[in-house]
């Protein structure tokens, strides 16, 4: 499970400041953590609105910017770490469209790999399309789409870890959520199909 912090909404114009990942299995078995702070890209600019928000989060911003390293060094190191983990690896985030987008862009740019697994002739460190905790939580709650949201889950699902916007804190909380969601999904009746159903 990965959480990222950035100085704007899009990797096309802004920079990822920090990220953290917790390697965890569906049953809660943990295999380690990875945390990094990245130097902002010289070809990107901070988003004014995002920086105004960061001004209200001084401790989180300090954690997201101190001890920064070149992403060209960090992202290959992260890819190596992912490959060193046991079993097959699946990227998970909340929501996938935000954190996954950033990580996919940086991995592609600096490590020659992707968050997405597929029929690509490149280094592949993850399998499949990944897990969106936002979607998984919303559907398993049985909530209508406009009532989805990670804040709608009880604190127990997070293991009572506060959401601080420090990447490692948030990744740890979301890792606990993932385990709880798999616990819920395991109680559901299976749905089966065949290859001929999908063309």
What kind of feature is each model-predicted range?
Residues 82, 97-128:
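Substrate-recognition/cap helix-loop segment adjacent to the acidic, metal-dependent catalytic center
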């Amino acid at each position: 499970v990965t959480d990222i912090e950035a100085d704007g909404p899009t990797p096309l114009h802004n920079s990822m400041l920090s990220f953290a990942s917790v390697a965890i299995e569906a049953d809660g078995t943990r295999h380690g953590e990875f945390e990094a702070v990245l130097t902002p890209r010289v070809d990107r600019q901070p988003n004014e609105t995002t920086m105004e928000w960061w001004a209200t989060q001084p401790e989180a911003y300090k954690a997201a910017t101190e001890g920064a390293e070149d992403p060209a060094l960090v992202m290959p190191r992260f890819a190596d770490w992912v490959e060193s983990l046991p079993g097959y690896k699946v990227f998970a985030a909340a929501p996938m469209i935000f954190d996954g987008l950033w990580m996919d862009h940086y991995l592609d740019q600096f490590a020659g790999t992707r968050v997405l697994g597929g029929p690509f002739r490149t280094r592949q460190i993850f399998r499949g399309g990944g897990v969106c905790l936002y979607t998984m939580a919303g559907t398993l709650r049985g909530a209508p789409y406009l009532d989805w949201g990670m804040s709608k889950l009880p604190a127990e699902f997070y293991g009572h870890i506060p959401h601080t916007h420090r990447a490692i804190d948030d990744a740890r909380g979301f890792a606990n959520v993932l385990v709880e969601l798999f616990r819920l999904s395991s109680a559901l009746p299976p749905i089966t199909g065949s290859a001929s159903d999908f063309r």
